[in-house]
Amino acid sequence: MKAIFLDKDGTLVDDIPYNVEPRRISLCPGAGSGLRLLARLDYHFFVVSNQSGIAHGRFAEADLKAVGNRLADLLFREQIELEGFYYCPHHPDGSVARYALDCFCRKPLPGMLLNAAQEHDIDLHASWMVGDILHDVEAGNRAGCRTLLIDNGNETEWRLGPRRIPTRIAPDLYTGAVLIASEEGARR
């Protein structure tokens, strides 16, 4: 199985910091049509998201269930199935002791992608990590995926390194999907 791993905030949905209110969650413009294009190429969809608001006490981990349900509903309306919603609740500087730690799941480390790959038999080399910051790119590269940076202005720490170079760059998810589709066509 090949997958599209999607960062949530700023990539798939509009970026409203620490938002867990389902009514305020909406897909980024062009996200639905871009994902439909990729679904026709037999990609499966997974969200992988750092949710440090849990570690910082901004919201409870239980609040993410409603977020996952809202994402699944929004994508269902676009005729897309969300097959997994993975999140990291940790942050080393968190104020909630249980979550204030370094971990392997927090991007830029690849833990969420590797867990999804193991649980769903995903071919990481045939998959893409799509996100709006270089931590997303680094996580995808560390996992062995191809990577797409959505350059929408959200990246503020342009610390470059060999693992932080994306395979492709696009201004939005729809344009990125077209690039992925064209690369897929070139491989055939």
Model region roles, listed by residue range:
Residues 18-26, 59-62, 99-103:
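Short glycine-enriched, charge-decorated loop/helix-capping segments at active-site entrances
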Residues 125-168:
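Acidic, Mg2+-coordinating phosphoryl-transfer loop and its flanking beta/alpha structural elements
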Residues 104-137:
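Conserved Lys-Pro-Asp/Glu-containing loop-to-beta segment of HAD-superfamily phosphomonoesterases
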Residues 167-176:
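Short acidic-hydrophobic, aromatic-tinged amphipathic segments that line or gate anion-handling sites
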Residues 50-51, 151-154, 173:
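Short secondary-structure boundary segments
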